[in-house]
Amino acid sequence: MLDVAIIGCGVIGAASAYELSHYRLQTAVFEAENDVADCTTKANSAILHAGYDPEPGTRMARLNVEGSALAKEICARLDVPYRQCGSLVLALSPEELPHLQKLYENGIANGVPGIRLLSAEETLAMEPNLAPNVVGALYAPSAAIVSPWDFALAMAEVAVRNGVELHRSCPVTHIEKTADGWALTTPDGIVETRYIINAAGISAQAVHDMAAPHKFTIQPTRGEYYLLDKSEGSRVHHVIFQCPNENGKGVLVTPTVHGNLLVGPDAVRVEGDNTACTAAGLAFVSTAARRSVPSIRFGESIRNFAGVRANVDTGDFVIGEAEGAPGFIDLAGMKSPGLSSAPAVAKEVTKILKAHGDLPAAKTDYRDGRTRVRFKECSPEEKARLIAENPAYGRVVCRCETITEGEILNALREEIPAATIDGVKRRCGAGMGRCQGGFCGPRVLELISKTLGISPLDVLQDKAGTNVLLCETKQEENHHD
């Protein structure tokens, strides 16, 4: 029997696995998709928020500030791309200045460090490409940008290294109470566990309702984005927000840790995991973004994408044991600032286990830390050494991002190996550049096929059913028969 079963391996599930892996617990993670961080965690604004937006006294307020500080430490320890660039919330008219004052007061109450109000002159001195009608801004120096999928993957990798089991493509389809805990039905069979952690993202309501009386409603909300080429990456140097509204933090403009410019999102209620991009949504995003940064060149867009966030009708994170379901712990409604809060949310789980007397001693042989080879960032001497040790580092496969065959093979052989083209991209960056895999994609597919010992026809772009190749050319006629 397991001590803890975690349902979902986005950033909340991964952070929970990482936290619990420090203790002598039998823990397993069950992820419905074929990879870690394959839903909301891979498609969001990639920001670790400072913590001035949540209302004081809410879980969001406390966990945002605590989580952002913990995330900074974890990223340094696990070699995750991270940059503390700070954020600006703009007032674009005098009527918006009172809102900045309210956010400032929130920030002071929430313990956000270094927060201050700026004049128009101070704001434009920091960001000359902003709209000239800016009348002021709220500056939060502790805000940061991160690679969200790498953040989740790094925590999951270290958890697996320290004994946590990870089951991919393994959705939980039924939950039943037992005398000793819970029984989960999965494609791998029945799994018994003492505790369940519900970290299922937009599916958290459905998972909760399998085990306990209905308590909350997840309202999936889609946000569409532009990802612009690195030629636009220095258009701004801070995360640029407009004054938020009832739909969220509004359309933002932000640099990324990879050197691009990210613009979005809108906020549209959808059914399920509907990540379609729309002409109307993208038009709204580009028009709204130009209110902040008029000179953005959207002709430099290299990709559009959408993510779905788990808005919830409670207005705050849902954290704790479900009523009438002892041992079933919800971590639900993790909309923004869910990414920022994830490490602190995970610590709430250990507090619950400790309160029950079920948190054992910490491991004395814990193996923390992680490093990644990023060939393009190496010195000439380091590159020469790597190539001498492994000639695969001397073969550049992705020319846009200077990603080598050695890095791709690492992605296919690490503790949580990639199994898809997008899985490789998230681990090492191959296909993330201007041509979006147009050049390197076939070679990446070939390396996946050879390394994993599968047919090229079985190589997926991302989720199940996204096979890149339909058939062998000479068999096309027979295939259609």
Role assignments for model-derived ranges:
Residues L2-A28:
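N-terminal Rossmann-like FAD-binding beta1-loop-alpha1 element of flavoenzymes
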Residues A15, I175-D180, L184-G264, V268-T278, ...:
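Flavin-dependent oxidoreductases
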Residues H22-K42:
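Glycine-rich FAD pyrophosphate-binding loop
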Residues A46-M126, G250-V251:
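Dinucleotide-binding Rossmann-like beta1-alpha1 core, especially the glycine-rich loop
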Residues R62-V65, L90-H99, L138-E157, A276-A280, ...:
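Short beta-strand to alpha-helix junction loop
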Residues L138-Y195:
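Helical element adjacent to the flavin cofactor pocket in flavoenzyme catalytic cores
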Residues G248, V257-H258, D273-V396, I403-I416, ...:
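C-terminal catalytic lobe of FAD-dependent flavoproteins
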Residues T404-E415, G438-P456:
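Iron-sulfur (Fe-S) cluster-binding segments and ferredoxin-like electron-carrier domains
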